[in-house]
Structure formats: C-alpha cells, structure tokens
A protein has these predicted regions:
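Structured, helix-rich domain cores that form ligand/interaction pockets
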Residues: 1-296
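Helix-turn-helix DNA-binding helix
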Residues: 298-304, 309-314
Length: 314
C-alpha cells in the first residue's frame, strides 16, 4: 500500500527593482554586524548573491541578489513547517491548518527585525513569488525508486519542456527536473537527497518526493485570480493547498499515463514470456517492449515520439 501526503514545502517572497547602491548599503551594514556572507559572484563581480546568517529564526533565509547595471532584489526563502514548528525535519510538509496566519507572521518578523537600521524593508513591497506544492509518497523498501524516477524521466513531454540533468550519474538516477514556462516539476529520492547533506530521514523511509514549483503567474492563473491584490498570502497558500491534488496529478498523469505494475526491462520480458500464452500476442508485446526500451535509451526522448502510447493488460 502506498501512503501519500501532500502539503507545501517552500515559499518565496521577493522585492524587485532595487539599485546596486541601495543594496550595497544593506550589504555593508550586515557585514559590519557579521550577519551576511557571499554565496556566489560572477567573474566580472557585477552579479553577487549574499545570504544572511543568524538574523532570522529557523525557516527564513534572506538572500540579496545584487546586479549591475540591471536592478537587483531581495528574496526571502521560507520553510513554513520549520518556522511554525521551530525545528527542521527534512521530510515534513506544511499544512495551512498548522498555522493559518504563517505568512502574516513572516511579514511581521521581517519588518521588526530591521526596525533599528537606517534602511528599512517594506513588507508591502514583497510579493509571493513562488510556492512549492509537494507530495511525499511513502513506499515499501522493496520498491526501487530509481526505476520509478526513470519512468517519469522518460515519460511523454512537450518539445518545449526542458529536462535538467546534474551531469552526475548518481544524482541523475535519483532525481530529475522538468522546466515548463512558469512551473518546474522535480521528482527525487528524498532519502538520497538528505543523505547527500549528511542528514537522514526518519525510520529509513523510502520516500519519493514530487514538487511542483509555481511562479506567481502560474499560481495566479491556476486560482483564476488575474491581478487581484485584495487576497492575502495566507489565503493564497490555503487555496493552493486545496488544489494541490489536482495540480500535481495533472503533471503526473501527463508524464506517466499508464497504470499497473512497472518493471525493469529484463523482468518485464520474463513476465511476458511466462504469463502470456498466446504466441502472436506475446510476440507483439515483446516487440513493442523492445522498441520502447530502445527509444528511451538511444534517442533520449522517452515515449514522446515515434510510437503511439500502448498499454498492456496481463
């Protein structure tokens, strides 16, 4: 039996259009207080990214994105579960019922944190720029997550969809990411990801995580809000949580429309040879299985071209 839970993993707030000089004032002040460090920069030093340290409670990260000559911005990355519970648990997700006013709390924390500084952060300037809707699938330890991830990766997709790879065989086996116009779908082995960071999930759980990261334009369209500004961030999170199932299920159904038992190629061949008694049907099934397998490995397009979708019933 598959146990699944759905919730929200990460949200982001963003203040855009800030000049290089105005951001430098903030950076200098935080450096004096030893509350900031340089995360990365380009070779010309015209683009820098800073993260704060020991400024906010666990669950809030402030990231300054400084660019020249283009304007930069300030990004707040929030883990609602960590913030509301006071502790970081890798596999846990946030549900709006845990703290219905979590975003109002975040805005107050941001405003009050810098009350004594010469510069201010106006919460009214912050927009809800990203929401990560998430599913955790708790599977039995006998299930090979890399095989499920492979099926997702080679599922049908549009030509305009970009498939990200990590250029690392192990990471590519345990995760993949697809980028659409204003959404990103990430599927990965949660235990593998956490282990890479030197942590562990509880009870050696075999967790397949599916994340749908929605930019502002995407979630506004999904909720049919157009350009409304009279709705609170907490209300947006609640409505997205209510639609979590439909939104993620749409992408899962599109990538993997088939149902039933999924097997590696060699095991599938043996199943067909042992269980399909009619020679002509067995021959056709083995033929299509071989064609699909070759298509997914030699062409790199999964099931997107050449052959139409086929389903077998055994």
């Amino acid at each position: 039996m598959i146990v699944a839970e759905r919730g929200i993993h990460t949200v982001e707030l963003y203040w855009q259009g800030l000049s290089f000089a105005s951001l430098q004032m903030i950076v200098d002040d935080l450096y004096d207080q030893k509350q900031i460090y340089l995360r990365k920069k380009n070779h010309l030093n015209t683009s820098r990214v800073y993260d704060t340290a020991n400024v906010f409670p666990d669950g809030i990260i402030m990231r300054i994105e400084q660019r020249y000559p283009e304007p930069g911005g300030i990004r707040f990355i929030i883990n609602p579960y960590t913030l509301s519970s006071g502790k970081y648990v890798p596999e846990e997700l946030y549900y709006p019922t845990m703290d219905p006013s979590i975003m109002e709390h975040v805005l107050n924390v941001i405003k009050n944190t810098f009350n004594d500084r010469e510069w201010k952060i106006d919460p009214q300037k912050l927009t809800l720029s990203r929401v990560d809707l998430t599913w955790n699938f708790y599977l039995s330890n006998e299930i090979d997550l890399t095989e499920i991830i492979r099926l997702f990766k080679h599922g049908q997709r549009k030509k305009t969809t970009k498939l990200d790879t990590f250029q690392d065989k192990s990471k590519d086996q345990h995760s993949f990411r697809m980028r659409f116009s204003d959404t990103t779908l990430t599927v990965y082995d949660k235990e593998f990801q956490v282990t890479q960071k030197g942590l562990r999930v509880g009870d050696n759980a075999n967790i397949l995580r599916v994340e749908l990261s929605m930019q502002r334009r995407a979630y506004m369209r999904s909720l049919e809000l157009k350009d409304r500004t009279d709705i609170s961030m907490d209300e947006v999170l609640y409505r997205l949580y209510q639609k979590n199932y439909d939104l993620i299920h749409h992408y899962i159904d599109f990538l993997c429309p088939c149902t039933g038992k999924h097997l590696p190629y060699q095991k599938a061949v043996k199943e067909i040879e042992n269980q399909v008694n009619q020679p002509d049907i067995r021959e056709k099934m083995l033929y299509f299985l071989e064609k699909y397998s070759l298509q997914g490995t030699t062409q790199g397009n999964g099931l997107t071209g050449g052959l139409p979708p086929v389903r077998f019933s055994m």
